[in-house]
């Protein structure tokens, strides 16, 4: 189970120290100095263990020990170090050389711990009478700031940043000039919408002006294509050598010439309508109506020519 404590040995005295024991210990340390604590009981004849001699010297008998109440600076140091180090009273006492670890521990348990509990609960921190003075308010605010500071430095920095950000937002909201300037500024989106609407109107006007000219150009191109396609068929039909096919081809040429005349009349009427501002879309429908029976006549003529050719072959 480990080494037993030295105080449990037989013949070792426990309890409070007597003045005679204190004088023997102080006189020996003044001669030999504090260091070899294990040799002190055997060299001085004290019925105490080495640990008890060391604690008696460091906590009560050594010179420079400060007695009495703790100052405000010492209280802040104890609160901060206890939050960082915990209940390591010897380590905390090393930062306060004039105080002992035993005194610091006793003062923490009897005073500072209860004081922090009161500050952490805001309801208990308030005065019951309601007539608290300015000094009590300042002490409460100091306690709250110390409570934040004792936990972590980063939290203190964050609290400072929050306070600065609140000051900036309040200053920006308090300025009436800035709010009026922000409200009076026009929105750029409305100007862009107006400009875009004007541009669209101008484009529509230009398109209406250019559309009849484009319609006339497309109609002329369509008429040229129709004439070229209509005159392609006679060249093929004229290449035949039989008289019946020649008659059919002459009929077909006459039909195509009449068709070209009809198309020329139609193109002239369309050009006049375009110059007068008539829409081209209304005139595109009659062209389709006129072209449909022409294709049927062409098929009928071709079928006739094929039947005549087959009859001649049968006669031969």
From Swiss-Prot:
| Disulfides per UniProt | none
UniProt-listed SMART domains: SANT
Q: Where does tissue-level expression of this protein occur?
A: Expressed in flowers, leaves and weakly in seed pods.
**Main localization of the protein?**
nucleus
Instruction: List, for all copies, the residue spans of the domain called HTH myb-type.
Output: 9-65, 66-116
UniProt feature, compositional bias: Basic and acidic residues = 135-144
| Protein's GO biological process | response to auxin
Q: Which InterPro entries match?
A: Homeodomain-like_sf, Myb_dom, Myb_TF_plants, SANT/Myb
Locations of Polar residues compositional bias? 181-193
Q: Which GO terms describe its cellular component?
A: nucleus
Where found, per UniProt?
Nucleus
Assigned keywords, A-Z: DNA-binding, Nucleus, Repeat, Transcription, Transcription regulation
> What are the coiled-coil residue ranges?
none
| DNA-binding annotation, residue ranges on this chain | 37-61, 89-112
Q: Which GO terms describe its molecular function?
A: DNA binding
Protein origin, superkingdom: Eukaryota
Show the segment(s) annotated as Disordered.
119-144, 168-193, 209-230
> In what ranges is there compositional bias, type Low complexity?
216-230
The protein's matches in CDD domains, at most eight in alphabetical order, are given as: SANT (cd00167)
Role, per record = Transcription factor.
Q: What's the protein called, per UniProt?
A: Myb-related protein 306
> What is the organism of origin for this protein?
Antirrhinum majus (Garden snapdragon)
Gene name linked to the record: MYB306
